[in-house]
Amino acid sequence: MSMNLSQMDIPQHLGIIMDGNGRWAQQRGLPRIAGHQQGVQAVKRTVEDCAEIGVKILTLYTFSTENWCRPKSEVDFLMRLAEEYTMQELPGLQRNGVCLQLMGSREGLPVSLLDILDKAALQTKANSCLNLNLALNYGGRAEIMDAMKAIISDHQQGNLEVSQIDEATFSHYLYLPDLPDVDLIVRTGGERRLSNFLLWRAANAVFWSMPVLW
């Protein structure tokens, strides 16, 4: 996928639903994993482009909670691909001033991947050109449910009164509490669905579906 955001108003927070890797591979008679490998190259270009044109926050829908239903071989490959991307791109992220963060549930993710992501987050946390959020093992409903459970727990422990619960308080319990609402959500592949992406933070977002495959 190639994007040219320089000709439109630059969003502060851009979310991308990266769709179409499998179809890209199928059209070329290749296995699905070839599409995922090609998709990583699109990620690299997109991160560089966003850093260059002034996008401050980029959230990529990397692996949804629903993706666990895919064949185990494909899931295992995607986890390894996430590890390889993080390790290989870390020098470039540092060079471009990119801060990398995991956005999603840690439960069920490989320990090796979590270790790599944690180290990358620590090494890049001082970077301020672009915040790159990998929505990995992420689902909008799961995020809201986890926030609700944490709020109930704090209330039961006497740390939070019902009168204190408002939108700002609720947002504080989401995966990345300081993350602002998303301004623009781009979905490649032609589908016109949010697919459980950034449900709480997409209240006022513009949605743009592109026919091009990721």
Feature annotation, model-predicted:
Residues M1-W214:
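Flexible, compositionally biased loop and terminal segments
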